[in-house]
Structure formats: C-alpha cells, structure tokens
C-alpha cells in the first residue's frame, strides 16, 4: 500500500514528524509531499523545506520527500499511485476541515481514501502557524525548541536569530 502525507511544512514540526513516523510504519511506500502554492508567502523556501524534511526522513527507508505545485493533492496522489492520503487530526476544527476535504477528494476520485490519525495529547497544540507566531517574542527560542525537531530549530535560529548554521547543524547531527 502506498500512502501520502502533504502540507506546506513551513516549518516542519514535531507533530509533522510524528505523523510521518506513523505513515512510515503503516505503508510500504510513503510520500511526504510539500504543497507549493504560488499565491502563498512562505517563511522558508521550497528548497529549505525539502532539505529539512529530507534530513528528518533519512532514517525511514520507505519515505520519499516530494513536492507539487498548484495541483489538487488528490490528483497528485493519483499521479504517484497512492492508495491513501494520511491526515493528522489535532482537534474538532481539524476534523471538520479534513472531513470536508475528504468529500471533495472523493468527488474527484473514488480510488484514493483518506485516513485520519489522531495526534497524541502532547502534540495537540503544535502547528506551523503557532511556531511562526512565536518568533520574535522575548525568549522565543526556548519555546519554539519544544515544538520542532533540532534540524528545524537550528534552521530557524539561523534565519531569525543569526547563528552559525554549520556549527548548529553539526550539533544537531551528533544527536542523531
């Protein structure tokens, strides 16, 4: 079975990484797809997000990081032969939105199903929007560190805090 998990991953969070781990266990082949919308503004470039996710997924042999632009996810999923779209659900709002998207996708194709996965309690409040909203406040670094993998944390410090990325990357890789 082939699965796909998509998002903007701007930036990737511990919640994203948890879902990726679940998908890697559930599917024989699992795509992590970065959706790129030319009308949307991002903190991290597509190349930066690809690099971060590739680093985060390096230990999963069956995971491939890809991207797609200006295309419906279900159509992209069809193009890579996916059987399932995996979606993380943190709360009722996520469920309502994702349920609606599942019905829209079902109208476009009946060959791909959506699988909802409930996030564990400790990840319920984690979102890329929350992370970006914290940057710039006093001591944002300590708070953000709780919600993102080390690779992402050091990229954020480099982008928003002016540290030496090569030193930070070496430190992050030593923890792997």
What are these regions (language model features)?
Residues 1-176:
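Nucleotidyltransferase catalytic core that binds NTPs
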């Amino acid at each position: 079975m082939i699965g796909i998990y998509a998002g903007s991953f701007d930036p990737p969070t511990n919640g994203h990484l948890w879902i990726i781990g679940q998908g890697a266990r559930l599917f024989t082949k699992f795509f992590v797809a970065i959706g790129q919308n030319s009308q949307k503004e991002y903190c991290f470039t597509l190349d930066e997000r690809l690099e971060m996710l590739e680093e985060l997924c390096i230990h999963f042999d069956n995971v491939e990081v890809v991207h797609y632009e200006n295309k419906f996810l279900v159509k992209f999923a069809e193009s890579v032969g996916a059987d399932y779209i995996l979606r993380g659900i943190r709360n009722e709002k996520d469920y309502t939105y994702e349920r609606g998207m599942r019905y829209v996708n079902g109208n476009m194709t009946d060959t791909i199903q959506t699988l909802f996965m409930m996030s564990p309690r400790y990840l319920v409040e984690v979102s890329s929007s929350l992370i970006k909203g914290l940057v710039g406040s006093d001591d944002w670094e300590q708070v953000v560190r709780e919600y993102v993998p080390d690779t992402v944390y050091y990229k954020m410090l480099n982008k928003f805090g002016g540290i030496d990325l090569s030193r930070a990357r070496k430190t992050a890789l030593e923890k792997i």
